[in-house]
């Protein structure tokens, strides 16, 4: 699971959590190939242009087994 923070050039910050293990790799691929990157926002989601992203952090959240 990842705690994701994306900062845009206009100062807008998006924070969300995802359990998709491929999300960091997908972000890197889309950034390198200048393709839109989908993120969840509210009940739906939006596409971000990687040229407008200042930084993206994917921090691993350790799951605790009960």
What is the predicted function of each stretch?
Residues 29-43:
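Acidic, aromatic-enriched beta-alpha/helix-loop junctions
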Residues 39-66:
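Short, mixed-charge low-complexity intrinsically disordered segments
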Residues 1-3, 36, 45:
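A generic structural signal for beta-strand entry/edge sites
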Residues 1-32:
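N-terminal acidic leader/helix
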